[in-house]
């Protein structure tokens, strides 16, 4: 399997935008192939990338559970589910996208989850990078077979509430039994005139130090991000000199050599 890069943080802090900006970087740098996984049921990574979502892993799982005997003749359940998963995989010129979708309903999902998890693991082996946009609880990664994360980005906006959510996520890692090799905090929506971490508020930095995780990137407030959102444009079309694009590039170029 390629390198696993995970992004986690409180909803509304710029987590999915950060994930989309990373996909933008990898596609422009042409250092893929990359598989982007939208593992947050409330996320819209596909939308930020300008991709239409036809199906999700959650849809496949729920539809199968409603009619587990509805497998076409000549196929077994494993082959049928793998066929549906291949259909749910969105293939773009520079990246592929898999949407995990809705969470489980009632009933026993052990068999179908085992098949879907195994397929996802095998699929990920075909890519140089696996970028996972997570829900705050990190449930998707905790259920993966290996649980290995080469780089975990903990995303917060420039607020104590966002940072405290990062602290809670950080505190869950041991319980989730995730094998995290490297991690760092990404602060979004910082003032455009902020040059580096030395300009961050003292109370904010005190809480960062209490968490014990290094800040690896500052993503400035970028009016283009709001413009693109209002115009429903893909963040892949952002100009290369956009402040957010430049900041993401500088961050990833420092991180890639160490993972």
Residue ranges and their predicted role:
Residues 3-41:
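Walker A/P-loop phosphate-binding motif and the immediately C-terminal alpha-helix
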Residues 4, 36, 95-97, 215-218:
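Conserved beta-strand scaffold positions in the cores of enzyme catalytic domains, especially
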Residues 111-218, 227:
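Conserved catalytic-core segment of NTP-binding enzymes
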Residues 231-242:
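C-terminal boundary of histidine-terminating zinc-finger modules
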Residues 247-259:
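C-terminal alpha-helix
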């Amino acid at each position: 399997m390629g390198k696993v890069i995970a992004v986690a943080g409180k909803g509304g802090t710029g987590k999915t935008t950060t994930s989309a900006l990373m996909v933008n970087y990898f596609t422009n740098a042409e250092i893929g192939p990359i598989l982007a996984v939208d593992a947050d049921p409330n996320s819209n990574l596909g939308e930020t990338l300008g991709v239409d979502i036809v199906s999700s892993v959650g849809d496949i799982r729920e539809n199968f559970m409603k009619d587990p005997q509805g497998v076409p003749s000549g196929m077994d359940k494993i082959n049928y589910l793998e066929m549906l998963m291949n259909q749910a995989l969105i293939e773009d010129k520079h990246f592929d996208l898999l949407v995990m979708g809705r969470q489980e309903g009632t009933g026993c999902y052990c068999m179908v989850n085992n098949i879907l998890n195994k397929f996802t693991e095998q699929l990920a082996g075909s890519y140089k990078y696996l970028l996972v946009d997570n829900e705050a609880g990190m449930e998707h990664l905790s259920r993966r077979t290996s649980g290995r994360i080469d780089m975990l980005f903990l995303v917060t906006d420039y607020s104590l509430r966002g940072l405290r959510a990062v602290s809670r996520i950080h505190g869950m890692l041991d319980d989730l039994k995730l094998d995290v090799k490297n991690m760092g905090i990404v602060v979004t929506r910082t003032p455009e005139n902020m040059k580096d971490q030395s300009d961050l508020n003292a109370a904010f930095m005190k809480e960062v130090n209490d968490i014990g995780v290094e800040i690896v990137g500052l993503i400035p407030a970028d009016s283009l991000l709001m413009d693109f959102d209002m115009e429903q444009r893909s963040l892949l079309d952002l100009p290369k000199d956009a402040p957010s694009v430049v900041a993401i590039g500088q961050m990833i170029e420092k991180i890639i050599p160490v993972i």
